[in-house]
Amino acid sequence: MKKSVFVLFFLCLALSCDASVWPAVWIGCHAEKSGADLRVAYFRKSAQLNTVPDAHLIRVSADNRYKLFVNGVLVSLGPARSDLSNWNYETVDIAPYLRQGKNTLAAVVWNYGEKRPMAQMGTNEIALLVCADGAAPVFNTDWNWQVLTGESYSSLDDFVVPGYYAADRGERFDANNYPWGWQTEQE
């Protein structure tokens, strides 16, 4: 009896979850580096808004980590740690950052590759998903987003620890190769 109640509870829980089909697609890019290396991509989409909504919720996720910007302002980091069967996303209200006229949504996405920290699950591909709730899907990820791969970040390959090590190897940042202004189209 306990076993059937337990199974019934989790069946009801699973059926109550948001299993709807999202009107956005995962987008990615081809990176020159191999799947073993840290790879970074910069995604961006601009759109004109005639009016600024009171609320504009979006759901956003990436493989592995992202920073999301609206009109150059950092608004979200994520996602929470996931596994390949249960991928997490963040829900963000971007309305306070929108303005009448041209708006730009941008994200930098890191994929740590095969040498990622033990807790960082992923597919070894750079990918981004943005899905807007409601009637304003202008920022949903689709093939109209611009993407740029970057060489400003690299792994610290010379970082060697004897024995078992489950954390990230660390990153090296080269500001000379960073695409300054990409968050707001100020290249």
What kind of feature is each model-predicted range?
Residues S4-L13:
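Sec-dependent N-terminal signal peptides
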Residues K67-G122:
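Beta-strand-rich ligand-recognition modules
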Residues V52-D54, A95-T104, C131-F139:
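A short, structured loop/turn motif at beta-sheet edges
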Residues L15-A19:
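Sec/Tat signal peptide C-region and signal peptidase I cleavage site
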Residues D37-L49, N88-I94:
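Short beta-strands within extracellular/lumenal beta-sheet-rich domains
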Residues S20-K33, V108-E187:
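An acidic-aromatic loop/edge-strand motif
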Residues A47-N50, D54-F69, L105-A107:
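Aromatic-lined ligand-binding clefts that engage carbohydrates, nucleic acids, or primary amines
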Residues H30-A41, P79-W87:
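Extracellular beta-rich ligand/substrate-recognition surface
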